[in-house]
């Protein structure tokens, strides 16, 4: 199948299912089961419930899809800090 025939939708991951599959609520209101694309697996991009994602679907089977992109969080506080708090140790 040519890439031009694939349809892209945006949605929200509502549930994580076994075997690396996800239940996704599309912006159109439909609910589908999607799996992680190979490039996301290769780059170890983790997807959690509540994440906004882009799903690629075949026009012949509108019940299944492939997660191709996980959108970054739009949190007002910025990304969470990790590691020890600053100022605890002095660099030389």
Curated annotation (Swiss-Prot):
**Keyword match Cytoplasm:** yes
**Which keywords, in A-to-Z order, does the entry hold?**
Cytoplasm, Initiation factor, Protein biosynthesis, RNA-binding, rRNA-binding
* Subcellular location, record wording: Cytoplasm
Q: Where is this region: Disordered?
A: 69-92
SUPFAM superfamilies for the chain: Nucleic acid-binding proteins
Q: Which domain of life is it from?
A: Bacteria
Q: Mind telling me which SMART domains this protein's record contains?
A: S1 (SM00316)
Q: What are the TM regions of this chain, as residue ranges?
A: none
**HAMAP family per UniProt:** IF_1 (MF_00075)
Protein name as it appears in the record: Translation initiation factor IF-1
- Please give the organism: Rhodopseudomonas palustris (strain ATCC BAA-98 / CGA009)
